[in-house]
Design a protein with these regions (language model features):
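Hydrophobic alpha-helix immediately C-terminal to the catalytic Tyr-X-X-X-Lys motif of short-chain
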Residues: 154, 158, 162, 192, ...
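Short aromatic-enriched loop/helix-cap "lid" or pocket-rim segments at secondary-structure transitions
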Residues: 41-44, 130-133, 183-186, 250-251, ...
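C-terminal substrate-binding subdomain of Rossmann-fold SDR/epimerase-dehydratase oxidoreductases
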Residues: 15-17, 29, 58, 196-332
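Residues in well-ordered alpha-helical elements
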Residues: 64-67, 86, 93, 104, ...
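N-terminal Rossmann-like NAD(P)+-binding domain of SDR-like oxidoreductases, especially those catalyzing
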Residues: 1-178, 303, 308-311, 317-332
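A glycine/serine/threonine-rich, flexible loop-to-helix segment
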Residues: 47, 134, 185-193, 269
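The catalytic Tyr-centered alpha-helix of NAD(P)H-dependent dehydrogenases
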Residues: 140, 144-151, 181, 185-189, ...
């Protein structure tokens, strides 16, 4: 079995590549990645020499590159995307190019090829914001509130149109917030962990009352694997972690695990269009595909913190580069 993975040097993508190669000894993966600021080949240092893995440097907007890399692949799993909300607020152009035009190129490749399934990794942010009650279902109307989420929602609608028009074997996965190993240190959880390891304060937007639904990366990889093999064409699957936590409470949990006081918290001005709450109803994927998250937040945070403590070689150069670029981004 052969899989074309796009964006496989990013956070979720690299964990998925490793997950698949570890689980399926006879699978092969071709990984296309543009190696933009968050794409890091060091994420896959341990499998570079694996004969089942091949890396292709390039952008998914490049039709010829995609066609050549696709070859006789059985599946495409599309992680390639610009994903940071704050960066999209400052400059949305890269998000439109990668997230919409890039998806279009992949869909055209599927339309003219013989792919068994095209799996697109979306986000819970396409649904917009929730109040204090209720959860997003797969039938919730899309109502994105940032340039980033608008670009992802646009890609989702394009995929829907290609399924309805051409009956392509497409499926969409909408995960909740992921956390775990190899996550770029501008994101909320690794930002807090690495700041504390460097004896720096941890910035929290507003009063820290925003709520996110968290899912450990290995659970998310298992969900995507399940959808790839068993998901029904034309469907959307919410892969939520069933773990809603206020940002401030999450920060306090990390401080407690790391033995730090709450004096390290620094409240900062809230960002524009900051969605109050995300929460995914994952009953469909549990019912139809028998997937459910297995790692509790306490266990996941402990494993994640331990990983960052043990892998300073990986995150410290990225952190220094962010500092040099004067990037003041703190949360997805």
């Amino acid at each position: 079995m052969k899989i074309l993975v796009t964006g496989g040097c990013g956070f979720i993508g690299s964990n998925f590549v490793r997950y698949i190669l570890n689980k399926y000894p006879d699978y092969e993966i071709v990984n296309i990645d543009a190696l933009t600021y968050a794409g890091n080949p060091e994420n896959l240092r341990d499998i570079r020499e694996d004969k089942r893995y091949r890396f292709v440097h390039g952008r998914i907007e490049d039709k010829n590159l995609v066609a050549n890399a696709l070859g006789d692949a059985d599946y495409i799993v599309n992680f390639a995307a610009e994903t940071h909300v704050d960066r999209s607020i400052r400059n949305s152009s890269p998000f439109l190019t990668a997230n919409i035009l890039g998806t279009h190129v992949l869909l055209e490749a599927v339309r003219t090829g013989s792919i068994k399934k095209f799996v697109h990794i979306s986000t819970d942010e396409v649904y917009g914001a929730l109040g204090s009650k209720g959860k997003f279902t797969e039938k919730t109307m899309l109502a994105p509130n940032s340039p980033y989420s608008a670009s992802k929602a646009s890609a989702d609608l394009l995929i829907r149109a290609y399924y309805e028009t051409y009956r392509l074997p497409t499926v969409i996965v909408r995960p909740s917030n992921n956390y775990g190993y190899y996550q770029f240190p501008e994101k909320f959880i690794p930002l807090m962990i690495t700041n504390l390891l460097m004896k720096k304060p941890i910035p929290i937007y507003g009063k820290g009352e925003n709520v996110r639904d968290w899912c450990f990366i290995e659970d998310s990889c298992a969900a995507i694997d399940n959808v790839m093999h068993n998901g029904k064409a034309g469907e959307v699957y919410n892969a939520g972690g069933n773990c809603e936590v206020e940002n401030i409470e999450l920060a306090k949990s990390i401080l407690k695990i790391m033995g730090k006081s709450e004096r390290h918290i620094k409240f900062v001005k809230d960002r524009p269009g900051h969605d109050y709450r995300y929460a995914l109803d994952n009953s469909k994927i549990k019912r139809e595909l028998k997937w459910r998250p297995s790692v509790k937040i306490e266990e996941g945070l402990e494993m994640t913190i331990r990983w960052y403590k043990d892998n300073e070689w990986w995150w410290k150069p990225l952190k220094e580069r962010l500092s040099a670029e004067s990037r003041g981004f703190w949360e997805r």
